[in-house]
Design a protein with these regions (language model features):
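The substrate-binding groove and active-site-proximal loops of carbohydrate-active enzymes
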Residues: 117-129
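Non-catalytic, glycine-rich low-complexity segments
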Residues: 1-42, 47-50, 85-90, 96
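Mature extracytoplasmic enzyme cores
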Residues: 1, 108-113
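Extended acidic/polar, glycine-enriched regions
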Residues: 37-110, 124-125
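Catalytic domains of carbohydrate-active enzymes, especially glycoside hydrolases
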Residues: 131-149
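Structural recognition of the beta-strand scaffold that forms the well-ordered cores
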Residues: 114-118, 146-149
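Solvent-exposed, flexible loop/coil residues
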Residues: 33, 110, 118
Length: 149
């Protein structure tokens, strides 16, 4: 298998990604497959990859636990590849994914309460790139944590 591009470490609840070079001819979305099995001490996940354009295929994973992980990648176009990466302590502002807390509330994985503060952006797909950037800047300054469009 050609050289894979991946991170040696990622924080808990962060985004780990591996990039696999492959064919870009034909219809790579339908004609090719990529799959990874990722195993840590407390979890094993089988994840389908996707075509990201320009002959690049990717698999993305969010680790739930700290420690050593192994990955095993198979595809329809290359030999099998294996490797390792380490999951470190989450950063101060990374509280993990949002879950149901009790029956009526939400909390991040680490127990920090989650308060949904959001808005709706109508006809988003009809806006100019400039208007989209302006809107995203305004939303960021307003401290929204969700958007519906």
């Amino acid at each position: 298998m050609e050289k894979l591009n991946y991170q040696d470490s990622v924080e808990q609840w962060g985004l780990w990604e591996i990039e696999i070079p492959g064919p870009s001819t034909g219809n790579p979305f339908k004609e090719q497959t990529v799959k990874a099995v990722i195993t840590g001490k407390n979890e094993t996940k089988e994840i389908d990859g996707f075509y990201d354009g320009n002959g690049k295929y990717k698999v993305r994973f969010m680790p739930s636990f700290q420690g050593e992980y192994q990955f095993h990648v198979t595809s329809s176009f290359q030999e099998t590849a294996e490797g390792r990466f380490r999951v470190t302590e989450p950063s101060k502002d990374n509280h993990g994914p949002v879950r149901v807390a009790g029956t009526w509330h939400f909390a991040y994985e680490d127990g920090t309460p989650y308060y949904s503060v959001g808005t709706t952006c109508y006809v988003w797909e009809l806006q100019s790139d400039e208007r989209i950037r302006e809107t995203l800047d305004n939303l960021k300054a307003a401290r929204f944590n969700k958007i519906r469009f």
